[in-house]
């Protein structure tokens, strides 16, 4: 039964916060949306249409109160990405927005406002009280998460706030409020939910808890830090598991995705794989897909502004104002990561080193209002003003020339487009940024329009040109292959880039411009949204092909996805099949299957030896231990089981019974690769306390079960990567198992053991097995299960007589499971008892026949 972890989450919310969440503060949305349901043409009552629910911290709305009527007025914010992405959805798709309003609506007005916004704008507002909003947004999001996700640890108060448990509770509370509002408009069987950004990273856990099959994606618009930075978060696991409760996780760049995958590997022990261009994380039977795609801009919006006469008039005024100057442009938010001061210093150095540029080059810096308040913002603003004043006083000239024109405050999109139009170069040198679309907007503007061309005096012989100087630490950098990439911390490099932009030929500028414009125009916001939406649909298509079970409490909740036919192996199922068969093959893993993983003494007990002998004494049985262990310990441990077969080192060595010799795999015995692998493993053994190396005849294994769990898993992943790199040209495979990293020859696997044994039984006995039991517990045993499914000889056995069984209720290729090692032993006892009973019945019949039929009469009858 699924644990009720939803209720347990209230323990993370204080009593005061919970009272804030009362109905009088958060009105319900109307649950039936216009256009959401239609008449069924086949006579049914209603047919639901799948809709997209776009969830973000703020709704794509502008709000103000009309002074004369004292009523609220709302309009869509055309600059909002969340509104623009609608263009990427299929036609006639219902889109519902869930988020906060950038307005303080009185509690008495909230119900009416909610109703109005839902009916007129398809928006569901989450009204957050000011004290809760302050702790959630300013306290946790902007002053704690934002710096860390931009690689800045809170070493001092000026570098961000320390972790505050009350702010974390506020973050949790707000995410819970968002979940409640989503539930009011959600059809969990059909709708797709798309969550945006770091403000709502634990929201997926609340949603997945309530509806296990919800179709859910998240896109992170900020950077994702390296694991060394991220692991400092006291709530790192809760946030990671929030991401993993999604079906699709999106990032702007591969670097951000790589850091996320590294965190999942090092902190949660999860592995990922790339198949046919898709990256997926296996998480308790679910595949969490990873999407890497930078967002684009809304081409139509920029084109319409370019065509406006108002824009042309603004361009004319700016052109007159900066007549005779070469204009470079910067457009940035006011925060500590945008590198504005570094840009100004580079500008000062450019003028210091190039006297001929003084009086000619102007850097126009537009600074958008800060999204948060605090001493850090004030310090940044103060520093920028001081540097600008210093450079202007040093290089300014009488008549009004100032090398730095600092525009600090809100600037309309129209005015920004006008500045883009007159600028020869745009400089974006943030020290860390999620995406930054300024270069995109600049490039599209520089492509021109009839109105802009007339305002700029653009002639028929003139060529389109633009130059972009971009920091290598921002999301758009990989997409702009023609940009001049710089390290913003290297002032000399930024200065040289500015100088190159001034001296670059028009032909070169045109080539770079055309290259960028082609990419930007084809990878717009609609393309981005459409691609994400299609991948989200693909990631969710198997939801109803599996059974989902809820596991865990609070923010550690997850679902386990299992095959619908996956079930516990019961005696009522296997014993009758065992009794009616005459040629049986029984394959048993050892560690974790018949011997508990946590047991220090791995030798089999006398009871286990006795049990195996009972099974082996049945002439209808062929019983094999199939293990990754070496042949010497297995041979020694099971010496008292004369009829037991052993396949050691994953099948490299095979022995049919204690009297038969060891057979070796037919693969070439080239073990020279050990000279390469051993020093690497030794290095990791010395660096990882508690780890050790096991050297087999055909393989080498690095064990870390006695090391620190987190560090051991981390080192295992690093060792795996290292060995795969140095052994690329060797005939081996490198695999991770349960607390191990193993190197073994190619073509050796437990799956090959299954094929070999069945083929041998067919060739020697003239018949295939009519009963097959295979039990294992880890990744290497999945090869056996896979071989059972695929091997053509096995497919001829009736499905009811094939029993592939894993240990533990977990995702597996096996059809059955047993809970633990004692359950395995108990099941084998059932089979042994069935064999004992058959033998007893046979002896009883034989004894009865001899007593009733004297030998002479038998001969006579014969």
Curated annotation (Swiss-Prot):
Against InterPro entries, the record matches this protein to: Glyco_trans_20, HAD-like_sf, HAD-SF_hydro_IIB, HAD_sf, Trehalose_PPase
Q: Where is it made, tissue-wise?
A: Expressed in leaves, roots, stems and flowers.
Give the EC number(s) under which this enzyme is classified.
Answer: 2.4.1.15
- Where are the residues of the annotated region Glycosyltransferase? 50-538
Provide an example Pfam family for this protein.
Answer: Glyco_transf_20
The answer to whether keyword DNA-binding applies is: no
**Phosphoserine sites (modified residues):** 5
Question: What is the enzyme's class at the highest EC level?
Answer: transferase
**GO MF annotation terms:** glycosyltransferase activity
Location of the region described as Disordered in the Swiss-Prot/TrEMBL record:
838-862
State the Gene Ontology BP annotations. Answer: trehalose biosynthetic process
Entry keywords, A to Z: Glycosyltransferase, Phosphoprotein, Transferase
Q: Which GO terms describe its cellular component?
A: mitochondrion
Cited CDD domains: GT20_TPS, HAD_TPP
Q: Which reaction does this enzyme catalyse, per its entry?
A: D-glucose 6-phosphate + UDP-alpha-D-glucose = alpha,alpha-trehalose 6-phosphate + UDP + H(+)
Q: Which PANTHER family match?
A: ALPHA,ALPHA-TREHALOSE-PHOSPHATE SYNTHASE [UDP-FORMING] 11-RELATED, TREHALOSE-6-PHOSPHATE SYNTHASE
Q: Which family does it belong to?
A: In the N-terminal section; belongs to the glycosyltransferase 20 family.
Output this protein's name: Probable alpha,alpha-trehalose-phosphate synthase [UDP-forming] 11
* Organism for this UniProt entry: Arabidopsis thaliana (Mouse-ear cress)
